[in-house]
């Protein structure tokens, strides 16, 4: 599924398990009961999502973009998020590990010394 365009799609009750989702585009999608489990979403784009019940487990979100897409209550702590691109609105309420929080601090303009 590399580079698949899901633009303007509505996805309901879908689990992407061990899926190769690199470079996929989920712009303007509606997500309801969606799970990414051990999915490789390197450089995927999630822009302007309408999210109801999203879970992400043990997935690669490296260099992925989450813009105007709520990650509230989404646990990212066991996923790789190196180089993630996001905005404060999307990030608010996301659950991350201590190490992830340190790297995400740059988005907030915080320098850790």
Language-model regions, residue ranges each:
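Tandem repeat scaffolds
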Residues: 1-113
């Amino acid at each position: 599924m590399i580079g698949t365009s899901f633009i303007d799609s509505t996805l309901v009750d879908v689990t992407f398990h061990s899926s190769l989702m690199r470079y996929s585009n989920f712009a303007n999608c509606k997500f309801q009961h969606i799970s990414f489990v051990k999915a490789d979403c390197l450089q995927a784009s999630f822009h302007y999502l309408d999210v109801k019940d999203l879970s992400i487990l043990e997935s690669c979100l490296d260099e992925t973009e989450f813009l105007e897409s709520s990650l509230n209550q989404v646990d990212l702590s066991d996923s790789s998020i190196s180089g993630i691109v996001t905005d404060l609105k999307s990030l608010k309420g996301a659950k991350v590990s201590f190490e992830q929080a340190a790297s995400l601090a740059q988005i907030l303009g915080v320098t850790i010394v």
